[in-house]
Design a protein with these regions (language model features):
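Selective transmembrane helix interface/packing segments
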Residues: 1-351
Length: 351
């Protein structure tokens, strides 16, 4: 119904807008979004294309989005769209780097840049990447929420300040395309999280439940594509919907500080941890053929809890160092927002 409504509505171009860039920007945003979605497999045998460097391909496509967003805001010749475009470009740039470093850590741990092979790695290791690199999973979810500009990172579209942000001047099907692109990127984020951290199309406890008489064969008959869809739907429901209804919008300076000062060092830390895990916890010559790991976890006799414990230790040290600065030093930063005199404390005539 909404699609038909947008389709029949009139599309108008602002009088002094840069018409070419104004018209091209929505198609640039939607096309890059569809390119990401086209790289995501539903199972080991159901996919549109399967290049060996599919993770690198996704990293490259993600870098195009800020360009289209800024062009859309700038070309409209509107102060609200320009402010929204600048906010969006700054936010996407700040969170793009931690996202790319997180994807790089996934490739380092799994030893491949191919999405399907990274899913097979989790099956062979006998553990999802969610448990092998919990910090990476948290970083991926946070950065993807910021990438799709969902609550609480929706400051570029703040209705109370900027009407509709950088897509204020778009109407008709162009507005519908931008609206569609936002949700497609959200669904693509859920699918990518499913493949990178939740084992993709492999069932949970597949080896344990699969060995149960009568129940096991029926359990293993569940199609892999259905498993992926259910996992992605649960990620969308638990993460994106919960965040939308539970969290409040945060200021632009807080968004940028959180991305540059907290997520970026944590992403670099995750890359280092992934390299250590790959070199010392897994056999670099290849994974075992058994479901539960074999050489994967017996290479040095290291227990399964090592990734979780080392992540917690490094996080504790990081936050201790992060909070070492005093309050006066933090408030002296040029981007810190403070109120010298609280509003409403003066009586009329006493300003």
């Amino acid at each position: 119904a909404d699609g038909m409504k947008f389709l029949v509505k009139e599309h108008m171009v602002p009088r002094r807008a840069d018409k070419l860039i104004f018209e091209v920007s929505p198609f640039l945003i939607v096309s890059t979004t569809l390119l990401i979605l086209g790289m995501i497999p539903l199972s080991s045998g159901i996919y549109a294309t399967n290049p060996d460097l599919s993770i690198l391909y996704i990293i490259a496509i993600f870098g195009i989005a800020p360009i289209g967003v800024f062009f859309a805001g700038w070309s409209s010749n509107n102060k609200y769209t320009l402010i929204g475009g600048i906010r969006s470009a700054a936010q996407l740039t700040a969170y793009e780097i931690p996202l790319l470093l997180t994807l790089l850590s996934v490739a380092m741990l799994t030893g491949t840049f191919n999405i399907i092979e990274s899913v097979h790695f989790q099956h062979t290791a006998g553990a999802w990447n969610l448990f092998l690199m919990p910090l990476g999973a948290a970083l991926f979810l946070i950065t993807m929420i910021a990438e799709v500009e969902r609550v609480p990172f929706d400051m570029p579209e703040a209705e109370a300040e900027l009407v509709e942000g950088w897509w204020t001047e778009y109407g008709g099907m162009r507005f519908g395309m931008l609206f569609m692109a936002e949700y497609i990127r959200t669904y693509a984020a859920c699918f990518l999280f499913t493949h990178f951290f939740l084992g993709g199309w492999h069932l949970p406890f597949q080896g344990l439940i699969g060995s149960i008489p009568y129940l096991g064969p029926a359990y293993l008959l569940i199609p892999g594509a259905l498993v992926v869809l259910i996992k992605a739907w649960l990620v969308f429901l638990i993460v994106f919907v919960w965040a939308r209804f539970s969290l409040a919008r945060i200021r632009t300076d807080q968004i940028l500080e959180f991305g540059w000062r907290m997520l970026l060092p944590l992403a670099v830390l995750q890359v280092v941890l992934a390299a250590v895990y790959r070199l010392y916890l897994f056999d670099v010559d290849g994974m075992a053929d058994t479901v539960y790991g074999g050489t994967a976890w017996d290479a040095l006799g290291v227990p399964f809890l090592v990734p979780a414990l080392t992540t917690i230790l490094w996080l504790a040290l990081f936050f201790l160092l992060l909070n070492d600065t005093g309050k006066n030093e933090r408030t002296a930063r040029m981007y810190h927002v403070q109120t010298v005199q609280p509003a409403g404390t003066h009586l009329p005539g006493q300003e």
